[in-house]
Amino acid sequence: MKRILLVNPNTNAATTASMLAIAREAAAGLLQIEAMTAPEGVPMITDPLALQQASQVLTGLIPELRAQNWDGVITAAYGDPALQALREGLDCPVTGIGEASMLEAAGYGAFAVVTTTPELAGSITAMAGWLGLGALFGGVYLTRGDAVAVTDDPALLVERLEEACLRAVHEAGGGLASLIIGGGPLAVAARVLVERVPVRLIEPVPASIRRIGLMVQRANG
């Protein structure tokens, strides 16, 4: 069985555990999924500086990851920190939850991202452009309130994300085929919202498992 490492670029071990459980469910026993929490950094990436710092931390882990001989690696924060560095430094396929979810969403048509971190909206928009998906990208919709405070309250997080999802659907006037819940710490809330949102909801962690599975399969010909 192929061994996949999901790396949480922030320092919150509870977030890592939640994402690992969701990833293993998505893998359905076809991949062996393990997880690692960043050894330093911030508990939640909320701005470009924290995203850059997370990239530096993950880049520093490349020698360790190379020695562990993973079959695939996932960078599991929505800004995909260190994605290119990991691809260049490792001898295995690498994806990120941002890239994987956007590419999956684009397969259905126009999409938007719903998230809690206003300071990362520019990075998310840039990612859509870098992936060549600008024509399908419907923008970033934000939850009300402080990102950390909202994320730390599971019930409030679901409520605010649902509100933002419904606002996105309304403002798009039926023009969106899907919405992405953008953020590793939002993974559990995304599971809840699948049944509540009137368009297809893309969960980044399961999307990354599907993508890395295909990448590993292709790499092994």
Where are the regions a protein language model picked out?
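N-terminal beta1-alpha1 ligand-phosphate binding loop
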Residues: 3-26
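Periplasmic-binding protein-like
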Residues: 6-7, 67-77, 173-184
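Short hydrophobic segments within beta-strands
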Residues: 7-9, 36, 114, 182
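N-terminal beta-loop-helix "entrance" segment that forms/cooperates
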Residues: 35-59, 148-153
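Glycine-rich, highly charged phosphate/nucleotide-binding loops
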Residues: 47-68, 156-165
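Short, acidic/small-residue loops that bind anionic groups at enzyme active sites
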Residues: 87-107, 193-212
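Active-site rim beta-loop-alpha module in soluble metabolic enzymes
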Residues: 117-173, 177-183
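Short, hydrophobic alpha-helical segments
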Residues: 169, 212-220
